[in-house]
Every structure is written in structure tokens, then in C-alpha cells.
A protein has these predicted regions:
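Transmembrane helix-loop-helix hairpins at membrane boundaries of multipass inner-membrane proteins
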Residues: 1-97, 172, 177, 203, ...
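Alpha-helical transmembrane segments and their helix-start/interface "positive-inside/aromatic belt" motifs
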Residues: 24-34, 144-149, 331-339, 410-422, ...
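Short aromatic-rich membrane-water interface segments that cap or initiate transmembrane helices
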Residues: 56-72, 178-185, 365-376, 449-455
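Cytosolic juxtamembrane amphipathic/interface segments immediately preceding
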Residues: 58-60, 325, 404-405, 530-542
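Hydrophobic alpha-helical transmembrane segments
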Residues: 65-76, 191-192, 375-384, 453-470
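Hydrophobic transmembrane alpha-helices and their helix-loop junctions in integral membrane proteins
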Residues: 82-118, 128-406, 410, 431
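Hard-cation-handling environments
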Residues: 411-465
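Aromatic-capped, Gly/Pro-kinked transmembrane alpha-helices
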Residues: 436-456, 477-566
Length: 566
């Protein structure tokens, strides 16, 4: 039997090209067939490197398959199937193509074995993510698309710079173990951190998810952040720096998630918290911890795709996703409410869900690592997940008293079909976790989550968190949702820092205009000053200092003139 050795992402990219020219009625079918083909290709090749070749003196590996890439590859292919099902009734041609490119680029990057292939595929996925926002009619979404482009361009520059350093240090372009204590490793770590939502960089996610469409937000959150997690697992397993970064990601965003009024922003903060758990597990680096990180990425992504699609449907139906304006939607959206409850319970780690299967691995991995602070941070993250995902989102959107009369118009069935498919996977993995465990890196995991000790631990965590939330609500210690937006670090980035950048740009423009108007005289002045400075090299130190002060005064005067003329 002939083995097909083709990067699975190529099937999605080819599907994107076909979808752009196919009739409107056929594009969802094309997307679904391309996603199914990608899933089939994810299981076809044997482990190892395939079809490597030399390019510009570097070894390029477009297909490398191991347990880590297969786990994320299967996950990305499944998410692509969900997005294809979601758009059967709803989507414009351009959005279908963009989602296929988003998924295809991320999937291609997961199977790439070198820096060149990885960054090329990852940036193709990034451009598709940006286009999903630019295709929206709202000005706020288009503005966020340009901000996302800026963040991801920064990630690209950092990655390419780090790759150049790493290639110079090692002589090869293989994407393998890296050290953040080298220039190349530090730059690539920062680049992947932007994608994964490290502190400060997380603001792009909490702004992009609410501005995108239901499918677009789910795709951006799933593919971009999990591609960052994959890159960290590939290059930085066992690095203690990631433990502390992951802990930071589980603390402050959890508070924002509980206090945020916009449920889609709250969901984005919740994803940052869960991503922090994965990154901390990667930092622990033991075989069990690496398996736990991959399993948690798998389970969390499935649940968050359901929640993102559901909140997108809520926004389309009610015209808002703000907790202060929602409530009572379970009566008119009962199926969506039920699917949201299952996904929320999975995030909270309830038994018989994929979240339980992954969280059991995470708890055991952190317990074996003997890191008390990390273990406590994980317990806090579980409690926060119960508070803001398992309780807040379902209650505020579907079961709280209605604040206004809910709309009665109908809605399409295809989003429910996509959410149902994801929910079946969530329950299926929870009931039979061995199916997921067989893919996990570095080797198939032999682990039984359903023993009485682990079940009791999870039940205690869930019940304790629920009681704590109830007590905090009754005593008004819980951060109640208020209309408006919370102040995050992006207020500083888009406020004083952006104003400073604008002033610097105006100053540079003023200096440039002054130079153009007085080009010859200014050039003569610089020539005389430079000659004077050079002549001081052999003179006493005091004279050097005196003339140096005059030089600085001249330069300060030129800068002041630039500010005046700006």
C-alpha cells in the first residue's frame, strides 16, 4: 500500500482556492470535504521526516510527523470541520476562503520541521485572521484588524530575527529545542508569546474575539493561540521560565474574566487563563506534563469553539453579548443553552467531559513536579474557570432574568450542528479518554482518570468553587458586571504610549521639513561640528567635555526646532 506523504494543511489551502471560485451553494461542501481530507492526511504518514530538500543553503522539511504535531494536527482538522459545518447556511464566499486559509496555514505550520516553513505557514494563517476582521462591515472590527496586523507583524519580525540568530549559531534551520538564554531563542520565545497571549500581548485576543464573526472569532482564538502553544511545546519544553509566565497568565486574566461585562471578552480572558495552564505544564517539561499540556489544549479548544460560536449566535439573536443586557435566552434558544452548559462543564473539568480527562493529567503532572506554588495557581485557575465559564456565561446569557424582551425571530441550524459535533467530541473523549491519550506526546499515555481519588478531588474543587462564587455573590464580594469596558493594558498602549509615538512622529517630520528647507546650511553646520569634534580627539579631556556640551546643545536645539515646526 502506497503511503501518502503530504502536509495536511495543503488540503485546506487547496480547498480555499476552490471555494473562492465555486458556486455559493457549493462552498460549504468544499470546505467540509477539504477539512475531512486534512483529517485523513493527519493519520496517514508514519512518524518521521518526509520530503526534505535544500533551499538557499538551508534544509527545508515541509512534513515532519511525531506525537506532538499529530495531536495538534488532528485538533486543527477537527476545528476546521466545525467551522465548515457552522457556515453551511451563513457565510459569504470571502469568509469561507479566509477561514480555510487560517486553518490551512496553522495546520501546515504544525507539520513543518524547520523555521522557514513554520514562519511562512504561520504568517499565511495570520493574514487570513486579519482579513476575517477587515471583511466585517463595522469600523471597530476593521480597526481591530489593523491592530491585529501590527501585533502579528511584531511576532513575525521577532521570529525571523530569532531564526536568523539560531541559524547562525547552529548552522541549521531545524525547528527543535531552543534556549531562551540565547539571542535567537529569546526572540523566538517572544514571537510565540505574542501568538499565545503572554501578559501584555494578550490584549489582541480580548479585542479580536468580540469584533470578529462567530466563526471568525472561534477560528482566530483556536488556531492562533494554539499555534503559539504548539511552538512553545516544540522549542521550550522543560524551561522554567514558562512556569512563571504560565502562572502570571492564570491570575490577573481570571479577575478580568469574572468582572468583564462583555461575555465574548470574558471568554477571551478565560482562554488566556487556560492557555496559561498549558504553558506552565510545558515549563514543567516532564513526559506526563507534556502529555497534559497537549491534552488540555485539545479539550480546551473544543469547548471554547462551542462557547465562541454560541456567544456569536447570542449576539446575532439579541444584538449584544453584554451580561448586563442579556438573560432569559434559554426559552428561545434551548438547544444552544444545553450545548453551552456541556462545554462550560468541560472547561470546569466535570467528569464525563474532555476537560476532566485533560485536567486529571494536569493535576497529576503538577503534583509530581513538587511545585506547591504552581499547584496552588492551578487550583485557583480551576476555581476561576468554574466561576466565569461554568457559571457566569451560561447564567448571564441564558438563565438570568430577562432584562428586555428577547427577540422571537428564527436562526439557522448550521451553527447548532457545528456545536453539536464539538459537544459529541467533548463527551466522547470524556467517556473514552484512551482515544485521546494514544496520540499524546512524547509517547502514548497509560493513565486512568476515573479512580475514586481523582473523582473526589474534582468534585471537591467544583463544589468548593461553586459555593465560593455563591457566597461572594451574596456578600457582594464577587466583581459584578457593570455596563462599560474594563481598563486593561491596552488603554495604556492606545492612550499615552500611542500619543507619545504620534508626538515622536511629528517631531521627526518637523526635523525632516526643517532639513529640507535649510538643507545646505544645516549640512554645512553638521560638517563643521563633526570636524570640530574629530579635532578634539588629541586635546585635553576638559576641552573635550566643554565642546561635547556645546555639541549636545546644538543637537538639542535642532530637536527643539523640529518640535516647533512639527
Amino acid at each position: 500500500m502506497t503511503e501518502i506523504t503530504l502536509n495536511p494543511g495543503f488540503a485546506l489551502l487547496l480547498g480555499a482556492l476552490i471555494a473562492l471560485i465555486a458556486p455559493q451553494r457549493a462552498q460549504s461542501t468544499v470546505a467540509l470535504l477539504a477539512s475531512l481530507a486534512a483529517l485523513g492526511l493527519a493519520f496517514t504518514p508514519s512518524f518521521g521526516e518526509h520530503a526534505s530538500f535544500a533551499q538557499i543553503g538551508l534544509r527545508v522539511v515541509p512534513l515532519r510527523l511525531d506525537a506532538l504535531s499529530q495531536t495538534f494536527g488532528v485538533l486543527f482538522a477537527l476545528v476546521s470541520i466545525m467551522l465548515a459545518l457552522h457556515g453551511a447556511d451563513l457565510r459569504a464566499r470571502a469568509e469561507t476562503g479566509a477561514l480555510l486559509v487560517l486553518a490551512g496555514g496553522a495546520l501546515t505550520a504544525v507539520y513543518a520541521g524547520d523555521f522557514v516553513s513554520f514562519v511562512a505557514a504561520a504568517e499565511l494563517s495570520t493574514l487570513a485572521a486579519v482579513s476575517l476582521l477587515l471583511l466585517r462591515e463595522e469600523w471597530a472590527a476593521q480597526e481591530m484588524g489593523m491592530r491585529l496586523l501590527g501585533w502579528q507583524a511584531l511576532s513575525s519580525i521577532l521570529f525571523l530575527s530569532g531564526a536568523a540568530f539560531s541559524i547562525g549559531e547552529s548552522g541549521g534551520a531545524d525547528f527543535a529545542r531552543l534556549s531562551p538564554r540565547t539571542p535567537g531563542g529569546a526572540l523566538i520565545l517572544a514571537a510565540l508569546g505574542v501568538k499565545a497571549g503572554f501578559p501584555i500581548a494578550h490584549v489582541w485576543l480580548k479585542e479580536a474575539l468580540p469584533r470578529a464573526s462567530a466563526a471568525g472569532g472561534a477560528g482566530i482564538a483556536a488556531f492562533t493561540t494554539m499555534l503559539g502553544v504548539y511552538g512553545l511545546a516544540r522549542g521550550y519544553a522543560g524551561d522554567p521560565t514558562l512556569v512563571w509566565i504560565g502562572m502570571a497568565m492564570t491570575i490577573l486574566p481570571a479577575i478580568f474574566a469574572m468582572a468583564e461585562d462583555d461575555l465574548r471578552r470574558s471568554l477571551a480572558y478565560g482562554l488566556v487563563v487556560q492557555t496559561g495552564v498549558m504553558i506552565a505544564a510545558i515549563g514543567v517539561g516532564s513526559p506526563l506534563a507534556m502529555a497534559a499540556a497537549a491534552a488540555h489544549a485539545f479539550a480546551t479548544t473544543l469547548a471554547f469553539v462551542v462557547l465562541a460560536m454560541a456567544l456569536g449566535a447570542v449576539r446575532e439573536r439579541a444584538g449584544t453579548a453584554r451580561a448586563s443586557e442579556l438573560g432569559g435566552l434559554a426559552r428561545i434558544m434551548p438547544a444552544t443553552a444545553a450545548l453551552v452548559c456541556v462545554a462550560a462543564l468541560s472547561i470546569a473539568g466535570a467528569p464525563l467531559t474532555a476537560g476532566f480527562a485533560s485536567l486529571a493529567l494536569v493535576l497529576d503532572a503538577f503534583a509530581q513536579a513538587e511545585r506547591p506554588l504552581v499547584y496552588l495557581a492551578l487550583i485557583a485557575a480551576v476555581g476561576a474557570a468554574v466561576a466565569h465559564t461554568a457559571i457566569k456565561i451560561p447564567y448571564a446569557a441564558f438563565f438570568a432574568p430577562a432584562r428586555k424582551k428577547p427577540p422571537e425571530q428564527g436562526y439557522f441550524a448550521s451553527p447548532q450542528l457545528a456545536m453539536l459535533f464539538a459537544t459529541v467530541l467533548i463527551v466522547g473523549v470524556g467517556v473514552a479518554p484512551g482515544w485521546l491519550y494514544q496520540f499524546l506526546p512524547p509517547d502514548p499515555v497509560r493513565f486512568s482518570p476515573y479512580d475514586w481519588g481523582r473523582l473526589l478531588t474534582h468534585v471537591q474543587l467544583g463544589v468548593s468553587a461553586a459555593l465560593a462564587v455563591a457566597a461572594a455573590r451574596l456578600t457582594r464580594l464577587y466583581p459584578l458586571e457593570k455596563p462599560g469596558d474594563l481598563r486593561d493594558i491596552d488603554r495604556l498602549i492606545h492612550g499615552p504610549l500611542w500619543s507619545l509615538v504620534q508626538r515622536a512622529a511629528f517631531a521627526a517630520g518637523g526635523i525632516h521639513r526643517f532639513w529640507r528647507r535649510n538643507e545646505q546650511s544645516t549640512a554645512d553646520l553638521f560638517t563643521r561640528v563633526a570636524g570640530r569634534w574629530a579635532a578634539l580627539a588629541d586635546r585635553p579631556t576638559r576641552r573635550l567635555a566643554s565642546d561635547g556640551v556645546w555639541l549636545m546643545a546644538v543637537l538639542a536645539g535642532l530637536l527643539a526646532l523640529g518640535l516647533v515646526f512639527a
